[in-house]
Amino acid sequence: MNPSLGRRHFLAATGTAAAAATVATGGAGAAHAATGAAPTTAGTGTDTDTGTGTGTGTRPFPLGAVTLLDGPFRDNQRRNSAYLRFVDIDRLLHTFRTNVGLPSDAEPCGGWEGPGVELRGHSTGHLLSGLALAHASTGEEALRDKGRRLVAALAECQSAAPAAGFGTGYLSAFPESFFDRLEAGSGVWAPYYTIHKIMAGLVEQYRLVGVGQALEVVLRQARWVDERTAKLSYEQMQRVLETEFGGMNDVLADLHALTGDPRWLDVAERFTHARVFDPLAGNQDKLAGLHANTQIPKMVGALRLWEEGRADRYRTVAENFWQIVTDHHTYVIGATATARRSTNRTS
């Protein structure tokens, strides 16, 4: 076990933040989010992803503190920004609007965002995050303004949810009945995965761009998640967690960091997947056959819970996961799975 493991080390080792720059500090601050700026006053839209338990002395550079010079990285940044400007938000919003009875004459998206696909809506969350990150990196006003328009449109959809028969705060591109199916075990793709992507994108819009409406929307979503999951027994919730749920524990821990409300840590802990966490807590390798990339956001969430002051067990789970994967499930090219599934131990 690596006693110095922190969130930045863990993320880099699992390949999810290899490009993030870190800087040593002499203060007592914890590791901050891989996507954010240095923390300032809460509510200003900057990264306040601080933890109470890490004791680490590293944090990432604020994105705006680094300017890329001409070269391949700058070229890629320009391409990325151009793509973000190109994406038609009304096409992505089509299924959100029609889901709650709002008019839309936009052409629906295809692929995994098609109107008949159960994962629809997740790309909108990715776009929210991408716009926020790109604006924080470049200062480009068009990216900031596009993110604000998208947040405002999602807020309108959320406000229309009760009239459509959905719970207050519900926001998605598919009906709430998907969660009825999830809880009943009758088969559905991955509804909490999509909810996580939307919530994470809204958090980034608030934290990196300062869009206050984004925090309002994501807190209403979080209240909906709380009310929905509070009704389930422990056994029922564990069955729910057998279906991919992204990093729900991670984003809820972020809400605690932003608001100071311990309620969000309580809700985050409901997304502790015992079948995965319990063996790791005992340093047992039960990863073979699991959907590999599904486990990484769970572990990031475990670290965030520990950073925000919850049990040391969460750090132990994440440390053991990191050590087991890097020592026994990693190929020479850096991959940790075959066909997205963890394989038997490689060493």
Regions found by a protein language model. Name each.
Residues M1-A17:
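N-terminal secretory signal peptides and thylakoid transit peptides that target proteins
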Residues L5, A21-A24, A33-S347:
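Glycan-recognition and catalytic cores of secretory/periplasmic carbohydrate-active enzymes
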